[in-house]
Amino acid sequence: MITPVSGLALAGDATDAAKLAKSYQLWGGIRTNHVISSSGSFVDQLGSSRGLSTPEDLDLLIELRKLADLVVVDAATARNEKYKRLSHAHLAIVSASGDFTSIPATSATDKVTLFSEAKPTVETAGVDHHQIASVDPFRQILLWAKGLGMSSILVEAGPRLTKICFETTKVSQSAITFTPKLPRNAVNGSMNPFSPSGELVSLAESTDASFTLWSY
């Protein structure tokens, strides 16, 4: 059960993940998505975000993917989270080194594209690959996506690639889930690890998480 608190969530009477995602509305450009612990960590002790997530957060992630044309993830996250081909959106996996080993999605025959500066270190037959500059990958990914008519991009990367995304491109929004739930008066710009100037446009909560949407 999700309780809408303010902004878009409250206006949309978002009492579950599907309604919350719908209240966020469609977007153009880049929306980033993250789950973060109250201490600011992006991963658990096993190096995965799954240990931080909650059932409602996972449901929200699925709903946000349904609204996206393209999901972008770094290879390390795709490996740790065992990413597979997505049912709704196209999946782009980014690696500076070209290491795409142990990622289930690389066995897909469609809807998956690999991006790296170096050539892939493993055989990825049937999967499209593009060589790009690792210092500014998003500019090239955006051009590629635009050419294919993809306008709504969801970035699910870790903090390093997300930081590059903010430095080199225009990010429209960030959907950030905090676990466990934060006191309502503690949800402010200082909690946003990417841009303290972001405007909080939506707040909702469950028993163990705070769901926020920031606009830039």
Region spans (language model):
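Enzymes that bind and transform nitrogen-containing heteroaromatic metabolites
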Residues: M1-Y216
